[in-house]
């Protein structure tokens, strides 16, 4: 069996250690070691290991490090790869929309949000992202509708804080306060939500 694995590795040009960098990168990313994750993902990319996932991971690391333009480039490269599954594409588009928001390319962020809405089941995170994009574009009613949907899907204290923060960033604190009040007046959804409330 070992001989078969080694011969397959030699035939494909990959060695057994190829996925080591990718796996370490995923672990580093999860632990918040973004510089290390980026380095490992770049090694995985250069070795051709899981290209779409590796580009996506490098993009997330760049996003977390505040290098938004470079993150967008990695996300674009990920989307160009063969075999980008539907779930992975949704994830990449979501992250790319966030990166576009960070560089204030609101039209591009909106385009990704629209693609997500057309091709995927909307969830609380997608509603929030779409609401945040609409708010950045001064589409207050659309933002409010999306935030309502996000909070309806995920009526937790964390979600209320997230929506409040989006409004606060636009000097619209009063609009966000109602989510905090609703979260505090309701019952906790789980132990973590109860703990978040103090």
Q: What are these model-derived regions, one by one?
A:
Residues 26, 60, 98, 132, ...:
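Residue-level recognition of tetratricopeptide repeat
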Residues 19-20, 52-53, 87-91, 125, ...:
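Start-of-helix register in tetratricopeptide repeats
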Residues 49, 83, 87, 120-122, ...:
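Short coil turns that delineate tetratricopeptide repeat
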């Amino acid at each position: 069996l070992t001989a078969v694995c080694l011969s397959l590795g030699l035939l494909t040009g990959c060695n057994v250690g190829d996925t080591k960098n990718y796996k370490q990168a995923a672990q580093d990313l999860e632990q918040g070691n973004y510089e290390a994750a980026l380095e490992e993902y770049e090694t995985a990319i250069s070795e051709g290991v899981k290209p779409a996932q590796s580009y996506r991971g490098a993009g997330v690391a760049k996003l977390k490090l505040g290098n938004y333009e470079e993150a967008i480039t990695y996300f674009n490269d990920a989307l160009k790869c063969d075999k980008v599954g539907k779930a992975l594409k949704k994830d990449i588009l979501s992250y790319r929309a966030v990166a576009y928001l960070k560089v204030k390319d609101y039209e591009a962020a909106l385009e990704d949000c629209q693609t997500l809405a057309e091709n995927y089941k909307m969830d609380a995170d997608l509603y929030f992202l779409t609401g945040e994009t609409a708010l950045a574009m001064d589409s207050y009613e659309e933002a409010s509708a999306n935030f309502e949907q996000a909070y309806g899907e995920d009526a937790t204290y964390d979600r209320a804080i997230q929506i409040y923060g989006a409004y606060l960033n636009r000097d619209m604190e009063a609009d966000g306060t109602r989510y905090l009040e609703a979260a505090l007046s309701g019952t906790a959804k789980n132990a973590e939500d109860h703990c978040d409330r103090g």
